Design a protein with these regions (language model features):
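Structured beta-strand/loop patches that form or line metal/cofactor-binding pockets in enzymes
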Residues: 11, 15-37
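A short, polar/charged loop/turn motif at coil->beta-strand junctions and beta-hairpin connectors
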Residues: 7, 23-25, 72, 281
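Extreme N-terminal tail/first-helix region
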Residues: 1-18, 214
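Short secondary-structure boundary micro-motifs
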Residues: 4-5, 26-29, 144, 292-294
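Short, highly charged low-complexity linear segments
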Residues: 2, 25, 136-138
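Acidic, metal/ion-coordinating pockets
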Residues: 39-380
Length: 380
């Protein structure tokens, strides 16, 4: 039987294997774009990923409970906030370097595209940036935000993806690089949205953003999505700078603004502004989903969600839009002394056999997601 998208969302949150093709009598096609937060491999997480039996790193058990939701979506994106390398020694905060095996495990879990522009992208210098992109290429993962050459920047500043039949142009930016300068002569390496990325971090490069978005509009995709590393760490509300920047992006053509960096969830909303062409434009903004994986221990840095954004294309009108969203609350559960310490745990329901302490933590995570992210909107 045909399923409307709102029904599909709820079905794939409970039984992803049973989700079929979407049909809609009105001539509209609707698909789901999954969005996750910051992928961080602090050393406790890296150590936990080591599998003695395999003699190799394997992150997949850590986020196995999120994988069905990623795989049920038509496309899945996140922010990769570490560098990757085939060789150690590995490190966590403040200069991240993680096993390249993470890339393959993320691809196997269901991710399609990763933002690589963030404040940790130069933690291991130019070589680390290159080895990260090499690892992602080897795993078959698309990426936006950093580049190995001027030619790559010219070709890949905008990544066009087929999201279940809806074309989406993805762009990626970061506010800065933790005071590490972009290598001289390689200004193409990192997509920065601030002109003062080494100092005050307060002056957006409006010319660059407007130029990039004009180029994205010229591709005539159904939608444009901007993945952006911004905001203030550990704040559960957006600030006025984020709102102003979101408005600038939406005004110039962005339909989705997908943020990260705060390490805790921040709200989801729709914003309406005057567009570059004088028309009224409405854009979807997720300011942050917090950490997808990490070993930060605050209850809110452990709290995240797998967000699915509903994208609908009216085939008769030839237009696409965001028509709703839903999410599954997740909690990073740490069990010291066990074979697997870290488990990103589905907090949408209490699993059978959960003790009272775990049940309380999962209920708190779900409540925090509702309070911070807001209520889902589907089928609209």
């Amino acid at each position: 039987m045909a399923m409307n998208y709102s029904d599909k969302v709820m079905e794939h949150f409970t039984n992803p294997q049973n989700v079929g093709e979407i049909e809609n009598a009105s001539g509209c096609g609707t698909v789901g774009n999954a969005v996750c937060g910051d992928i961080m491999s602090h050393m406790p997480v890296t150590n936990d990923a080591w599998d003695e039996g395999q003699g190799a790193y394997d992150y997949s058990p850590i986020f196995a409970q999120a994988a069905p939701y990623l795989q049920a979506a038509d496309y899945a994106v996140a922010n990769l906030e570490t560098t990757l390398s085939e060789t150690g020694p590995y490190s966590g905060y403040p200069a991240f370097k993680s096993p390249a095996a993470l890339a393959g495990d993320l691809a196997e879990a269901g991710f399609d595209l990763l933002l690589t522009a963030n404040n940790h992208c130069l933690d291991r210098g130019w070589d680390g940036l290159v080895s990260t992109l090499d690892a992602l290429d080897g795993a078959g993962l698309a990426h936006v935000g950093t580049c190995r050459s001027a030619e790559e920047r010219a070709e890949n500043t905008i990544h066009v993806a087929d999201v279940g039949g809806i074309s989406v142009a993805f762009l990626g930016y970061t506010y800065g690089t933790n005071g590490i300068p972009v290598p001289q002569g390689r200004e193409y390496a990192v997509s920065l949205f601030n002109t003062d990325y080494m100092t005050t971090l307060s002056t957006p490069d409006t010319g660059r953003l407007e130029e990039d978005l004009a180029a994205a509009r010229a591709l005539d995709t159904d939608l444009i999505a901007v993945m952006i590393h911004w905001g203030v760490e550990y704040q559960t509300t957006q600030n006025s700078y984020q709102e102003e920047l979101a408005d600038l992006l939406i005004s110039n053509g962005a339909d989705l603004v997908l943020g990260g960096h705060s390490h805790v969830p921040q709200p989801i909303e729709q914003r309406t502004v005057a567009g570059w062409d004088g028309t009224e434009r409405t854009g979807f903004v997720c300011y942050s989903l917090g950490n997808f994986i990490s070993s930060q221990v605050d209850p809110l840095t452990d709290t995240t969600a797998v967000l699915t954004v509903e994208l609908t294309r009216d085939n008769a009108a030839g237009e696409a839009s965001v028509t709703g969203w839903d999410y599954v609350p997740m909690l990073m559960v740490r069990r010291d002394g066990t074979e697997r310490v870290f488990t990103l745990t589905d907090a949408s329901s209490i699993p059978a056999g959960a003790d009272s302490a775990l049940a309380a933590r999962l209920e708190e995570a779900a409540a925090n997601c509702r309070e911070i992210l807001g209520e889902p909107r589907t089928g609209g």
